[in-house]
Amino acid sequence: MRAYERLLDYVKVYTTSDPESGTHPSAAREFDLAHKLVEELKALGVEDARVDEHCYVYGSLPATPGCEEKPALGLIAHMDTAPDAGGENVNPILHENYDGGDVVLPATGKVMKVSAVSYTHLRAHETSQ
């Protein structure tokens, strides 16, 4: 499975946090993605992959031979999503050959303003066509 295919699969998992909760994680459903990640890490050879009671996923890979003395690399990311936008029944869309302009959602025709015209800070990342 390619990295973008994994990401498209992950965003389908309902992980919306609960702002009224006093627990960590704020919603038990957040463990669904954590357990999925542990399963995938183990399938990729991360034998010690695990999730703790706070929904943190851990795992380690041995160093490449000859690099054992090099600094270790750590990765960290949020797995929950903000309650501001719905997180249930997400159906991601891959826009192949995206040109950097506004995005039209095929199901509704709704236009998402994401172009450099709408967000001037994106202009620094434009490439000439």
Regions found by a protein language model. Give the residues of each.
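N-terminal hydrophobic or amphipathic helices/low-complexity stretches enriched
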Residues: M1-A28, L44
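General alpha-helical segment detector with a strong preference for membrane-spanning helices
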Residues: D18, A82-D84, Q129
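Charged catalytic carboxylate motif
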Residues: R2, D32, K36, T120
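Conserved small/polar residues in nucleotide/adenosyl-binding loops
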Residues: Y14, T120-T127
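A generic, well-ordered mixed alpha/beta core segment in the N-terminal half of proteins
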Residues: G74-R123
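A non-catalytic alpha/beta surface segment that caps or lines the substrate-entry region
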Residues: G22-K70, G74-I76, D80
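Alpha-helix boundary/interfacial micro-motifs
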Residues: F31, P62, L94-H95, H125
